[in-house]
Amino acid sequence: MSRAVVDAKEFSHAMSKISKVLKKCAIPFLEEVCLRIQNGRCTLTATDLETWFTAELPASGDDMFFAFRKTKDILRACSHFAGELTMEFSETRSGSKKVGKVLLRCERRGAEFEVYDGADYPNTPQASEGDAFSVSSARLSACVERVRYAAEKPSVSARPAAICVQFCGNSVYALDGTRLACDTLEGVSFPKPFLVRADVLAHLSAFGKEDM
């Protein structure tokens, strides 16, 4: 059995934030949050295979790696926790598959859930060295909101670039072939030009005013 401790409120906030990307899916994993505790950090990941959200918070104790089975139930349970949240993770083998359970305990409250093997969760893409950058979520979100009206709505006939917001230098702009909207982010320099679908950028609101 592995045992680790995190701050309950911080954990609940992070779970709530990244789970906004989850939606009903035929692939069970894509409705769940994956958890990895390693080197004193708890990393939570959620994805729909187009957008990836991760959040990190301090943790103490043993390493563990799994994906929740009922993220929505975990969110409800965590909303009642405060103080130190203890996670006790155990797994057994059933044929070639690992079967795991996690017990969440906070003072006198507790709940046990079945979990998936974390090794089966989709791997998070890693940015190439030099491609990562930091920016205020609030500033970026405000900038995107000022230009995204000029991006075309996603459709079968839409050109990929037309449904995206584009980033280059310190400029943020959208162009659907008829309209052009442009804004700048002073003090920010994007490592190289890239595009992101305008509807996906709505998830920026989940980060609030934090840097990312």
Show where each model-derived region lies.
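Structural preference for solvent-exposed beta-strand-turn elements
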Residues: 1-212
